[in-house]
């Protein structure tokens, strides 16, 4: 399977050209990204029983998901966060991308909670301590559903993958549970405070 990989190196224009625009290396096509966004929206709206109004996209890169969100849900308030200076300089104003990371969410001037929180292609690059801190910050910002792309050591991945970062699925399960997350499958998660809105057989634990 392919990932929207975010390596630990420089997130400059060349990085995005290779992994997002070059047909030989890009991890997802525009059509595949659109299906991801449509699915995340549908899952969140099923949970909330209303249209999604606010989206937080952490690790947004150049904000490739922003135009898809606004096309599918005109009027949605999209906020992107990314550590890439290039992404913020090139797209920060037009796509509302702020400089920061999942580990620094608590230091950013963000809304108290978002209907849909997305973090795709970056969580598995964090150190164990950074991961624990990051997923707690994400839970604090999720007022509905989170779409958190996570892959484990047991998955067959293709992408810009740094050596030695993959961790066993059991580690992710323990860590996510300790951070208060409830899994729904297909990369969808809800914080414990939202678990009452999910049928018992839908929950992963």
Task: Name these PLM-found stretches.
Residues 121-125:
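Short catalytic micro-motifs in class I SAM-dependent methyltransferases
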Residues 1-110, 126-205:
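Class I (Rossmann-like) S-adenosyl-L-methionine-dependent methyltransferase catalytic domain
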């Amino acid at each position: 399977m392919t990932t929207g990989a975010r390596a630990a190196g420089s997130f400059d224009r060349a990085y995005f050209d290779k992994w997002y625009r070059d047909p030989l290396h890009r991890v997802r096509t525009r059509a595949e990204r659109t299906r991801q966004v449509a699915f995340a929206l549908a899952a969140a709206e099923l949970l909330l029983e209303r249209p999604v109004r606010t989206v937080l996209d952490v690790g947004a890169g150049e904000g490739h998901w922003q135009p898809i969100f606004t096309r599918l849900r005109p009027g949605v308030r999209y906020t992107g966060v990314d550590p890439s200076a290039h992404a913020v300089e090139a797209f920060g104003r037009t796509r509302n991308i702020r400089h920061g990371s999942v580990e620094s969410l608590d230091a950013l001037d963000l809304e108290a909670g978002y209907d849909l929180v997305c973090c795709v292609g970056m969580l598995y690059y964090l150190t164990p301590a950074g991961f624990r801190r990051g997923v707690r910050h994400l839970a604090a910002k999720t007022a509905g559903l989170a779409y958190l792309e996570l892959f484990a050591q047991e998955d067959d991945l293709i992408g810009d993958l740094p050596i030695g970062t993959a961790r066993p699925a059991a580690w992710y399960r323990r860590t996510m549970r300790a951070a208060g997350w409830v899994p729904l499958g297909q990369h969808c998660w809800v914080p414990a405070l939202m678990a009452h809105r999910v049928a018992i057989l839908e929950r992963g634990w």
